[in-house]
Curated annotation (Swiss-Prot):
It comes from Rickettsia conorii (strain ATCC VR-613 / Malish 7). This is tRNA (guanine-N(1)-)-methyltransferase. GO terms for cellular component: cytosol. GO terms for molecular function: tRNA (guanine(37)-N1)-methyltransferase activity. It catalyses: guanosine(37) in tRNA + S-adenosyl-L-methionine = N(1)-methylguanosine(37) in tRNA + S-adenosyl-L-homocysteine + H(+). S-adenosyl-L-methionine binds at residues 115, 135-140.
Length: 234
């Protein structure tokens, strides 16, 4: 049995596993560290045309995904994954962060409802206590790409996915990590000099105390310049 299982409701089932079938996530999938199933919302569509959307009450642009169609598909998903927490990628949602990812993993059974068109009927959110989740202040064509993004983040937090689990402690946004929730420092590898640009000498010194101080100073400077709001808790 896998550590994490995701049920994905979408009108484009062929989009999964997508990028999650490659690299670390793909290897973890093959090892059954995580698993998924996809439900095609259109299978629950109405009439011979499998309609899943309709015009909005009160007017407005765009079509809305129908609650009766979504309800049938969600009921099917809950029958397969009865204790799952349900998420709906939406620009109205709580912004997804590294700490939010860890919070989500308290429940290892997740359902992702991928919206399309103008969105979904509000009554679906109320009926199933769906949690809205945002990957940023911009608009995408549907919930599939945010779902892939969120799952990629969750998967790499699972035990056995990263070759060295300590890697997590030296990454950006890790509140208990090396940079205390700030941005990661600048990174360098061979060659020592490239196109006239040299690796900072402190990194070649072998003095671990000075190297650690440099990394923390770099992290603080970069965070202050690019994401100053992260410093309020540092």
């Amino acid at each position: 049995m896998s550590i994490l299982h995701a049920t994905i409701l979408t009108v484009f089932p062929e989009m999964f596993p997508g990028t999650l079938g490659h690299s670390l996530a793909g290897q973890a999938l093959n090892k059954n560290i995580w698993s998924y199933d996809v439900i095609n919302i259109r299978d629950f569509g109405l009439t011979k045309h499998k309609n899943i959307d309709d015009e909005a009450y009160g007017g407005g642009n765009g079509l809305i995904m129908r609650p009766d169609v979504l309800g049938s598909s969600i009921d099917h998903a809950l029958a397969l994954n009865p204790n799952a927490e349900m998420y709906y990628p939406s620009p109205r949602g709580r912004v997804f962060t590294q700490s939010f990812a860890k919070e989500m993993l308290k429940n290892k059974n997740l359902i992702f409802l991928c919206g399309r068109y103008e969105g979904i009927d509000e009554r679906v959110i109320e009926e199933y206590n769906v949690k809205e989740i945002s990957v940023g202040d911009y608009i995408l064509s549907g919930g599939e790409i945010p779902t892939l993004t969120i799952l990629d983040c969750l998967i790499r937090l699972l035990p056995g996915v990263l070759m060295n689990q300590n890697t997590l402690s030296s990454e950006s946004f890790e509140e208990d990590g090396e940079f205390k929730g700030g941005l990661e420092c600048s990174l360098y590898t061979r060659p020592e000099i490239w196109r006239g640009r040299a690796v900072p000498s402190v990194l070649l010194s072998g003095n671990h105390r000075l190297i650690n101080e440099w990394k923390k100073e770099q992290s603080h400077m970069i965070t202050k310049l690019r994401r100053p709001e992260l410093l309020k808790d540092l």
